[in-house]
Structure formats: C-alpha cells, structure tokens
Amino acid sequence: MMSKLGVLLTICLLLFPLFALPQDGDQPADRPAERMQDDISSEQNSLLEKRVTDRCCKGKRECGRWCRDHSRCCGRR
C-alpha cells in the first residue's frame, strides 16, 4: 500500500510542474504581432506626445536634458 502511494505521489510531483508551467508557444516573445498591438507608443497616443513635448520644449532652439537624451525635441522624431 505504501509503495503504491509513493509511486502515485512521485508521478503527481513529476507531472504537475509540466502542466503548471506555460508552454513555449504561450510566451509573449513568440507572439510579435500581439506585442506590437499591445505596445503603447507616443506615435499612437497624442496625450503622451503632448506631455513629452511640454516637458521637453523650452523654446524653439532649446531642449531640456531629458528630451536631448531621448532624441525628441519640439515635435522632432
């Protein structure tokens, strides 16, 4: 009786992690089309673009440090 219980426990412990872990096809890195749809970029979001522009621009020729570091100043890409 104890050996049967041990075998059953061993089988359960070996099989459970295989089903509990996500499979390779379920990883976001394997689904680039879905990642691109979920990507929220400033090109798609005008409110974010406005916030970045307001944060960067101090004048026509002057850019803030954050804006220079991120290659965005006064609407330039």
Curated annotation (Swiss-Prot):
Compartment list: Secreted
Primary localization class, coarse: secreted
Disulfide bond positions: C56-C67, C57-C73, C63-C74
Residue numbers spanned by region Disordered: 26-46
Compositional bias (Basic and acidic residues): 28-38
Keywords on record: Amidation, Cleavage on pair of basic residues, Disulfide bond, Ion channel impairing toxin, Neurotoxin, Secreted, Signal, Toxin, Voltage-gated sodium channel impairing toxin
Positions of the propeptide removed during maturation: 23-51
GO molecular function: ion channel inhibitor activity; sodium channel regulator activity; toxin activity
Sequence positions bearing Cysteine amide: C74
Signal peptide: 1-22
Miscellaneous section: Negative results: does not block rNav1.7/SCN9A, and rNav1.8/SCN10A.
Swiss-Prot/TrEMBL domain comment: The cysteine framework is III (CC-C-C-CC).
Identification of the protein by name: Mu-conotoxin BuIIIA
Lineage of source species: Eukaryota, Metazoa, Spiralia, Lophotrochozoa, Mollusca
